[in-house]
Amino acid sequence: MARYFRRRKFCRFTSEGVVEIDYKDIVTLKNYITESGKIVPSRITGTSARYQRQLARAIKRARYLSLLPYTDLHQ
């Protein structure tokens, strides 16, 4: 039987030494939301708990300021 090697997930923000996630950095935030607009959980992305909280806060702020959509485009 073939065994599949699961790659260990790592926190991108920890490795890059990010101090705080900015809500104005839309390019980064878009990588952490689904096509339907939901925030991707940390067990999928590998983000640490500290940065997951900052990420959620930044996404919610960006949504409130209409920088990011709450849902998909409904096309």
UniProtKB/Swiss-Prot annotation:
It comes from the Bacteria. InterPro entries: Ribosomal_bS18, Ribosomal_bS18_CS, Ribosomal_bS18_sf. Keywords: Ribonucleoprotein, Ribosomal protein, RNA-binding, rRNA-binding. One of its GO terms (cellular component) is cytosolic small ribosomal subunit. This is Small ribosomal subunit protein bS18. GO terms for molecular function: small ribosomal subunit rRNA binding; structural constituent of ribosome. Belongs to the bacterial ribosomal protein bS18 family. Part of the 30S ribosomal subunit. Forms a tight heterodimer with protein bS6. GO terms for biological process: translation. Binds as a heterodimer with protein bS6 to the central domain of the 16S rRNA, where it helps stabilize the platform of the 30S subunit. NCBIfam families: S18 (TIGR00165).
